[in-house]
Regions:
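Surface-exposed coil/turn segments at beta-strand junctions on protein surfaces, enriched
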Residues: 34-36, 65, 119, 130, ...
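Short Gly/Pro-enriched turn/cap motifs at secondary-structure boundaries
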Residues: 19, 116-117, 183
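C-terminal beta-signal and adjacent terminal beta-strands/loops
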Residues: 91-105, 130-201
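Extracytoplasmic loops and strand-loop junctions of Gram-negative outer membrane beta-barrel proteins
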Residues: 9-16, 53-58, 106-112, 120-121, ...
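Feature marks flexible
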Residues: 2, 14-16, 184-185, 189
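Gram-negative outer-membrane beta-barrel transporters
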Residues: 5-101, 196-198
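Exposed loop/turn and edge beta-strand positions of beta-sandwich/beta-sheet ligand-binding modules
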Residues: 25, 68, 122, 135, ...
Length: 201
């Protein structure tokens, strides 16, 4: 089953492959090492080639699917694992956006997807854990780069309104409204505090 957002304007088209091609090839490399005692370094790189044959367009790159992703994780634990420090950095590759997104512009009038692809973007995560007998207390932060997808809502701007980042609010009543064209983070930096309790071992 193909879910096609691009065949007919303002319409989601559902149809069977009917002998057409659809595939996803993924290649992944993993690397793990402990350069010094209690310090673990892990790295992963994945490349994805996902394509689907669309009506009258032939074999097309699957939209909103990242071409590649790289992840680096550093974890250090003190003696007896009383403290654990965890840092993760990732780079997320570009992905093809829907054709109706190619004309979208930012608050300065610049095209967001001039080549038809989303930008590559980095993400950083940090977590510190203090371990007691049967209880872990952890403090962490996600998306430390505070990267967020611009113009998350697609549609016709409403006159006389200003939304996030100075952009006009989108008219949700019109048929060109779309809130599903998501390729990146929609929330900025988030800090959290948690408690983990072990009932038994």
């Amino acid at each position: 089953m193909v879910v096609d957002y691009e065949n007919i304007a303002n319409t989601i088209d559902f149809y069977a492959l009917d002998g057409k091609r659809s595939f996803s090839r993924s290649y992944q490399i993993d690397f793990n090492v402990e350069p010094v005692r209690r310090l673990t370094v892990s790295a992963t790189f994945r490349y994805t080639d996902a394509r689907i044959e669309m009506k009258e367009r032939g074999l097309t790159e699957k939209p909103l699917t990242s071409r590649y992703k790289g992840v680096l994780n550093l974890q250090y634990a003190t003696n007896l694992n009383k403290w654990v420090f965890d840092f993760t950095a990732s780079i997320n590759g570009k992905s093809r956006v829907y054709s109706f997104m190619e004309g979208l512009r930012d608050e300065n009038g610049k095209l967001l997807y001039k080549d038809g692809y989303s930008p590559a973007y980095p993400l950083l995560y940090l977590q510190v854990t203090k371990r007691f007998k049967g209880i872990d207390i952890y403090l962490g932060a996600e998306n430390l780069t505070n990267f967020r997808q611009k113009n998350l809502l697609v549609g016709t701007p409403m006159e006389g309104t200003a939304g996030h980042g100075g952009m006009a609010a989108v008219n949700t009543a019109l048929p060109d409204f779309d809130a599903s064209a998501v390729w990146g983070p929609i929330m900025g930096t988030k800090v959290y505090l948690g408690l983990r309790y072990t009932l038994w071992k």
